Amino acid sequence: MLRLDNNKKEKNIQENPYEKEKNKITKKKKSNIKLSKFIAPFVSKKTLKDICECGNYVEYITDILEKKYKLYRAFFCKNRFCPMCSWRKSLKDSLLISILMKYIETELNYEFVFLTLTVKNIKGDELNDKIKEMNRAFTKMLKRAEIKNLTEGFIRKLEITYQKEKFITKELYEKKYDYYKKRNLKIGDLEPNFDTFHPHFHCVIAVKKQNNHNRISQKRWKELWQESMKDKSITQIRVDDIKKKSDNKEVFEVAKYSAKDADYLVNENVFNYFYKALKGKQLITFSGCFKDSLILYKLGKLDYLKEIDKTEYVYCVGLTWVKKEYVLDVFRELSVEEYKEINKRLIDELDCEIDD
């Protein structure tokens, strides 16, 4: 069994489901420890204690061949800045949003538009006011007749990224090729947005069936957003029609973290800006048919749209955090009661990889 194979070569570790899952949660726990140092001045002793103890012991369930590991239970602090908890929440939100979209598409016969609305990069002390400005502008934009007559509801998620690289790396250059090429910048040059923040909205908008008469072009979306923000310098927005509800790429974009721990844990000063900007903010908003469908989801009335987890789980695997790593603490067969409780249940999260 994989749990006993302690001499497995490094090159095979990524092929080992146990090691892969262990490495994933180890990375989040290490980020959680870093968070506890940065967040200490802002929270009570009890909250800090909960954050420090988050994920100290976790239990997985796995099949007889140990090909799939599913997180079964653990103590989670549920703090919105906790890397471990935000990771877990994003997986559950991915399922939630995908189910709402399935329901709205099949039962209400609406289509979807995926919209990313951006603003220019800003300094940390501008974040709070800029987010408020974006919220007002978004509300104003949706009141425009050409949008109001087309839309039936939306999900809006706030995300903030931080430009921590001082120089343009190969990875950055490939990601922002058009931006750099337009400015005659190359790999190794100073990154023009170094030490700035980029707040933006990821939105899924439910719309009536579109045709050539009522479809809003990307150019028009950009104009409407520029007018609502009163900023003609905004150039980067993205508009996509979501053709298939089975294509979850857009769902993951909306469900993923509002801020990546790799960004907000760069240093204490950067974290302070993120914390003050996001503390108390509503990060994800449901409106119209999405809000109505969310009520049905919470009541369990959309469970018929969920799939059954077909994996037969037979083992429980417990890991304890000791100093700087997780140590295998428990490996046992599930009890008869646990086996009945766990197996043949509806899925409660989407099994997906969300970028760190």
Language model features with spans:
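Short beta-strand->loop micro-motif that forms the acidic, two-metal-ion catalytic signature
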Residues: 202-206
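Right-hand nucleic-acid polymerase module
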Residues: 1-197, 207-356
